[in-house]
Design a protein with these regions (language model features):
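Generic recognition of flexible, low-complexity loop/linker segments
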Residues: 5-6, 128
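Catalytic core of bacterial c-di-GMP phosphodiesterases, primarily the EAL and HD-GYP domains
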Residues: 13
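C-terminal subdomains that position terminal phosphate/3'-OH groups for nucleotidyl transfer/ligation
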Residues: 19-173
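Amphipathic alpha-helical "coupling" segments that flank catalytic cores
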Residues: 6-9, 54
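Divalent-cation-assisted or electrostatically stabilized phosphate/pyrophosphate-binding catalytic cores
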Residues: 2
Length: 173
């Protein structure tokens, strides 16, 4: 892992990867890659490599690599992605995808909420408003409500959220 990481972080990383491929070392190590974009983040570099073997990453490195790969599969950075994955991972994936960093920062700053705790209604309040017991349906409803707020289809205001829930209750129950 350390030796490959040194190659990935080198200014001559493309040459290093070509040599690994040329001498069939990629096959031996269970690595493959095609198009490759340099990033200043090692997880971003590793996320672009397909790995057939278990490489000893830390838990955080593994999580970030998987998140970056998920975003790369989607081929875009949206408000939903920024909310779900956060700014850091989205910036790395955006760099690989060729998306302007300033656009990602601007989109992130314009998010009405950044975490579940920012929603003006708690899970308990949602249950009380709808007069239902906590359940998977209510959790899904909360998730849907968060998406509506993120995409500015409803404002993150307690009264408006309550109205929205009551108006759309029949969708879920």
């Amino acid at each position: 892992k350390e030796e490959i990481s040194k190659i990935l972080f080198s200014s001559n990383f493309k040459k290093g990867l070509q040599l690994l491929h040329q001498f069939s070392l990629c096959e031996i190590m269970g690595l493959s890659f095609s198009d490759y974009v340099y990033t200043n983040d090692l997880c971003g570099m590793w996320a672009q490599i397909k790995m057939n073997r278990n490489i000893p990453f830390t838990k955080i490195e593994k999580e970030n690599i998987v998140k970056i790969q998920d975003i790369l599969k989607r081929k875009q950075i949206t408000r939903d992605i920024l909310y779900e994955y956060g700014l850091y991972v989205s910036l790395i994936a955006g760099e690989i995808l060729g998306i302007d960093v300033n656009n990602i920062h601007k989109m992130y700053q314009e998010l009405p909420i950044y975490t579940r705790k920012d929603l003006r209604l708690s899970f308990k309040e949602i249950c009380e408003i709808l007069e239902v017991k906590p359940s998977r349906k209510v959790k899904n409803m909360e998730f849907f409500l968060i998406k509506e707020v993120i995409n500015e289809r409803v404002f993150n205001n307690k009264r408006l959220l309550k109205e929205y829930l009551l108006t759309n209750k029949s969708r879920w129950f």
